[in-house]
From Swiss-Prot:
<dbReference type="GO" id="GO:0009535">
    <property type="term" value="C:chloroplast thylakoid membrane"/>
</dbReference>
<keyword id="KW-0602">Photosynthesis</keyword>
<dbReference type="InterPro" id="IPR017486">
    <property type="entry name" value="PSII_PsbB"/>
</dbReference>
<comment type="similarity">
    <text>Belongs to the PsbB/PsbC family. PsbB subfamily.</text>
</comment>
<keyword id="KW-1133">Transmembrane helix</keyword>
<keyword id="KW-0148">Chlorophyll</keyword>
<dbReference type="GO" id="GO:0009772">
    <property type="term" value="P:photosynthetic electron transport in photosystem II"/>
</dbReference>
<dbReference type="GO" id="GO:0016168">
    <property type="term" value="F:chlorophyll binding"/>
</dbReference>
<keyword id="KW-0604">Photosystem II</keyword>
<feature type="transmembrane region" description="Helical">
    <location>
        <begin position="140"/>
        <end position="156"/>
    </location>
</feature>
<dbReference type="InterPro" id="IPR000932">
    <property type="entry name" value="PS_antenna-like"/>
</dbReference>
<keyword id="KW-0934">Plastid</keyword>
<dbReference type="Pfam" id="PF00421">
    <property type="entry name" value="PSII"/>
</dbReference>
<keyword id="KW-0472">Membrane</keyword>
<keyword id="KW-0150">Chloroplast</keyword>
<keyword id="KW-0157">Chromophore</keyword>
<comment type="function">
    <text>One of the components of the core complex of photosystem II (PSII). It binds chlorophyll and helps catalyze the primary light-induced photochemical processes of PSII. PSII is a light-driven water:plastoquinone oxidoreductase, using light energy to abstract electrons from H(2)O, generating O(2) and a proton gradient subsequently used for ATP formation.</text>
</comment>
């Protein structure tokens, strides 16, 4: 036929069985990729330290999605929360991966079968004997089945009626585990951070889908609407399907980047806004203040801060710090976190406590400034020492650590103080191992960043695809050069441009 590469899909335009075949093959490829990717990730994943080396630091992409749906055990004998298990059951990480690969193989065989046996009675119109599809009826069937799946997920899987539940955690990502969730039917169900909304919205949307599917199965569209929306044209289906996909992609890009109950920070890492707003820093100070109010010493109060909470308050875990095109996991950027050194408290000669101004998200370098009270600069690490007034040496800054590995240790040596002041710009200070993965200090993004970038990019691309195919199906007659009100007999093939006698073909 000599079709250009961008038009090869026209071969299934009027061939319903082979249209079905290529869609089954697409499902085979998607399921096969998911299963294979899961097995690859399981081969390289280190589950030994869920606090300082969680899945999102290691660049895992499909494991977080499996985990949020209730998979926590491995046939390797480990649990995602760090424990060991003896009976992981069938639906472990490996079991789910294997099921996807088996399903992929079955879809592959089904696709071949439907490609070979394309001339089936079911695809023939009884009146004309030609292949045709009743698209409004197929729409009703798909809507009904997707409604059943949606309702079933919300009513059974999420609630635990028949299923494990989903991953639920506290606002600071410390106590996450898989648990059952009751539907939330009040206005709080619209809060994107309330897990109960996941159950209730799936139940409601599924019910609506079932009812809408039954409606479209039992009621035929009016002729004027059928013709106006080109409901008999398969390209209309393509256009509206692309619309559904790009809309969903935009939504999930938002819920991933800004955070929601469906994207827990324990599985995908913190959001950039939690760094920008000092979210974890405020919680840490609140806990320390509460400890001091209970007559604990400063050292005791800081020692009770969970290492997990302190680790979130580190700029290296900010997904916006990694470049979009820097390959590799976060561990490949700054190294594998080994331990929290503790919270550094800086003081000048007068004993005033100084605070290091933290680096904003979109800076790679930032002046090291130590402030007192309401932002009064008391010390810095100057760019030009000849003009300095507030250098660590001149001001006489010391640093003392509370909590962590250096609890109770203090330094007055200016070089050491400056080293820790520079590191305090990046949040809480951690010992990192750059040698194991040959990490060279350039931050990487987390799976949260990759997912957002990928889905936002493809959503934009698919938006233009929707416009393109929607225009083609609505204005098909215009693009083909046929006037819809044309009364004259048109001889196809007589003219280079249809119906234009000035472009009469020359006989060869």
């Amino acid at each position: 036929m000599g079709l250009p590469w961008y038009r090869v899909h026209t071969v299934v335009l009027n061939d319903p069985a082979r249209l079905l075949s290529v869609h089954i093959m697409h499902t085979a490829l998607v399921a096969g990729w998911a299963g294979s990717m899961a097995l690859y990730e399981l081969a390289v994943f280190d589950p030994s330290d869920p606090v300082l080396d969680p899945m999102w630091r290691q660049g895992m992409f499909v494991i977080p999605f499996m985990t949020r749906l209730g998979i926590t055990n491995s046939w390797g004998g480990w649990n995602i929360t760090g424990g060991t298990i003896t009976n992981p059951g069938l639906w472990s990480y490996e079991g789910v991966a294997g099921a996807h690969i088996v399903f992929s193989g079955l879809c592959f065989l089904a696709a071949i079968w439907h490609w070979v046996y394309w001339d089936l009675e079911i695809f023939c119109d009884e009146r004309t004997g030609k292949p045709s599809l009743d698209l409004p009826k197929i729409f009703g069937i798909h809507l009904f089945l997707s409604g059943v799946a949606c309702f079933g997920f919300g009513a059974f899987h999420v609630t635990g009626l028949y299923g494990p539940g989903i991953w639920v955690s506290d606002p600071y990502g410390l106590t996450g585990k898989v648990q059952t969730v009751n539907p939330t039917w009040g206005v709080e169900g619209f809060d994107p951070f309330v897990p109960g909304g996941i159950a209730s919205h799936h139940i409601a949307a599924g019910t609506l889908g079932i009812l809408a599917g039954l409606f479209h199965l039992s009621v035929r569209p009016p002729q004027r609407l059928y013709k106006g929306l080109r409901m008999g044209n398969i390209e209309t289906v393509l256009s509206s399907s692309i619309a559904a996909v790009f809309f969903a992609a935009f939504v999930v890009a938002g819920t991933m980047w800004y955070g929601s109950a469906t994207t827990p920070i324990e599985l995908f890492g913190p959001t950039r806004y939690q760094w920008d707003q000092g979210y974890f820093q405020q919680e840490i100070y609140r806990r320390v203040s509460a400890g001091l109010a209970e007559n604990q010493s400063v050292s005791e109060a800081w020692s009770k801060i969970p290492e997990k909470l302190a680790f979130y308050d580190y700029i290296g875990n900010n997904p916006a710090k990694g470049g979009l095109f820097r390959a590799g996991s976060m561990d490949n950027g700054d190294g594998i976190a080994v331990g929290w050194l503790g919270h550094p408290v800086f003081r000048n000669k007068e004993g005033r406590e100084l605070f290091v101004r933290r680096m904003p998200t979109f800076f790679d370098t930032f002046p090291v400034v130590l402030v007192y009270g309401f932002g009064i600069v008391r010390a810095d690490v100057p760019f030009r020492r000849a003009e300095s007034k507030y250098s660590v040496e001149q001001v006489g800054v010391t640093v003392e650590f509370y909590g962590g590995e250096l609890n109770g240790v203090s330094y007055s040596d200016p070089a050491t103080v400056k080293k820790y002041a520079i590191r305090a710009q990046l949040g809480e200070i951690f010992e990192l191992d750059p040698a194991t993965l040959k990490s060279y200090g350039v931050f990487r993004s987390s799976p949260r960043g990759w997912f957002t970038f990928g889905h936002a990019s493809f959503a934009l691309l698919f938006f233009f695809g929707h416009i393109w195919h929607g225009s083609r199906t609505l204005f098909r007659d215009v693009f083909a050069g046929i006037d819809p009100d044309l009364d004259a007999q048109v001889e196809f093939g007589a003219f280079q441009k249809l119906g234009d006698p000035t472009t009469k073909r020359q006989a060869v």
